[in-house]
């Protein structure tokens, strides 16, 4: 599942100049984006399922 794949855009070793708060904000933004995509996929599947039943 793509939710558990590692993000290759992030460096493997944290930059010492990057603050802990900045890393937390970045991780929170990524999680929020993943949840948004997941919600959209689920809603599309539910809508598709509703339309397929009526046929």
From Swiss-Prot:
**Keyword entries, A-Z:** Cell membrane, Developmental protein, Glycoprotein, Membrane, Transmembrane, Transmembrane helix
GO terms under cellular component: plasma membrane
Q: Name one GO biological process term.
A: cellular response to hypoxia
For this chain, the family text in UniProt reads: Belongs to the DVL/RTFL small polypeptides family.
Provide the topology term for how it sits in the membrane: Single-pass membrane protein
Record function comment? Small polypeptide acting as a regulatory molecule which coordinates cellular responses required for differentiation, growth and development, probably by restricting polar cell proliferation in lateral organs and coordinating socket cell recruitment and differentiation at trichome sites.
Name the domain of life: Eukaryota
Quick one: where's region Required for DVL/RTFL small polypeptide activity? 19-50
Q: What is the lineage of its organism?
A: Eukaryota, Viridiplantae, Streptophyta, Embryophyta, Tracheophyta
Q: Which residues cross the membrane?
A: 32-48
The molecule here is called Small polypeptide DEVIL 10
Where is it chiefly localized?
Answer: membrane
Q: Where in the cell is it found?
A: Cell membrane
Q: Which residues are glycosylated?
A: 7
């Amino acid at each position: 599942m793509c939710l558990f794949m590692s993000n290759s855009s992030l460096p493997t070793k944290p930059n010492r100049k990057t603050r802990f708060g900045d890393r937390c904000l970045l991780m929170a933004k990524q999680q929020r984006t993943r949840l948004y995509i997941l919600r959209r996929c689920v809603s599309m599947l539910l809508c598709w399922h509703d339309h397929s039943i009526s046929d």
